[in-house]
Amino acid sequence: MKIISLFFFLGILQVSYSQEAPIIPSPEKPSVTDNILFELKDWDPIRGLWLSESIMAMSTNQVIPDRTFAEELTPYELLSLMPKEKREDLKEYIESNNTGAQTTNNSFTTLLLALINNTFCKTIQGRSYGDPHLKSFDNATYSFQTVGEFELSKSSDRNFEIQARQKAQSDNFSLNSAIAMNVSGDRVGFYAEDAPSRNVTPLFLDGAPIQLQGRTYFLPHGGTIKLNGSNYIITWPTGEILILNNRASGGRNFINVTVTIFECSTQTYSGLLGNANKNINDDFNGRNNNQSPPVYQAFSTFGNPLMQQASIIAEKEYLSYLSQSFADDWRVTDMTTLFDYSNGTNTASFTDRRFPMVHLTVADLNANQQSMARQRCEAMGISLDEMGGCIFDQGYLNIAPNPVPSPSLATEGVVLNKLERPLLNTNTHQILAPKNPSGEAQPKTPSENTIEERPGKTDIKTYENNNTIVKPSQPIQIKVPNNNNKPAPINTNKPINTSPVIPGKNEKPGKG
């Protein structure tokens, strides 16, 4: 009886209290984004936190936080080092749960899913080399002796763009003298010649000269620049790679260009390197796919036996199309250029629509010249699809054969040892890689791990993490969101971040 009376009294008290006390809401169910952030941090408390914050920043076109570990990696590169099973689980979770209702940041999950997909994807390459001979992403090859500034390749989200400046070597030959690019919002220029100001460095970031100081340079929006031999390697935070090989011929400096993108990318591409749609036959149709190339495009400009069946008139007509109508479609304007200019110059200053005066081909070389050039190209391991361009450059300009560069990936040999605490790693504040529990040094990345702090900058910016990551209520098990990404704005001013600006010193043989 006493127990019943006590329960009755407590019941009355509870009803009375519930009528007067405010209702406290129960904790909200963790969102898809919350669960993903938890999983990334659970994988690696320090690197995973930086990775999640970086991808979040990238999804809104913001500057990423400073690295808190010794490895000199982009967000994509770090993600690719995550165990395969973990990446597969995240991919499945995003695809099955991203309905929009639970997702607090669709742009974040969309970008993360794209990055994960790229880690499982093959890459494809486009090239512009020598007196420029171009190979598209779909393996179409052609010769492009023109003068001016051109859109080499551009993605539909406009976070990836590369432009090439071609400069006359003589009346009939031209070379790549400068390359400009948009690296996810950072405007980078590389000038083998005609730099916008007198500096010993060929590199410019948002119009100001920079030096690599013998190590990887971190770009504000997550990309990196490093020097490997004579190759400058620019890596996008999303994984695309540009290799610039700095060379010389006839007293002039020039650049061979190799561009690597993902075969499975959801982006569409435009420019001289084609649309990467696996169709070799539409790479010469112009910007709006509305050009009508001469029928000669079916034949090779360089040494293909079928060329002998084509008339000289048809051949010249084809080359004329490439250097005029096709070229004009891909010229940049004062509104679209990414290049830096000295006072009084603009893109028109580097344009000559009369060029070349005469269209020359391998067929204009005598048999002995062709044979000697071919032998040297073969000895250097030049591939079949670039053989014609190599013979041309050897025969006319004596340019040494240049095989496609294949530097080591930044992730090669990297082991992610456990970190006990964050280690600030910026362009101005460099760190000594921590020791393993065994006392041995961590394995080195392809670039220097041991770095010193440089004088001259004391306002080092650090990022505090105030995010609370909610532990998921159930294991990750992972609907593709709408793409809300906006194109990254190009910064035309000097960046304000921890990156210092330091003044100072299959295969198809084809048409190029």
Question: Where in this protein do the model-derived segments appear?
Answer:
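Sec-dependent N-terminal signal peptides
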Residues: 4-12
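N-terminal start and proteolytic maturation junction detector
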Residues: 6, 281, 298, 339, ...
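Sec/Tat signal peptide C-region and signal peptidase I cleavage site
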Residues: 14-18
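Von Willebrand factor type D
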Residues: 20-108, 113-424
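Extracytoplasmic low-complexity, disordered linker/stalk tracts in cell-surface/secreted proteins
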Residues: 414-512
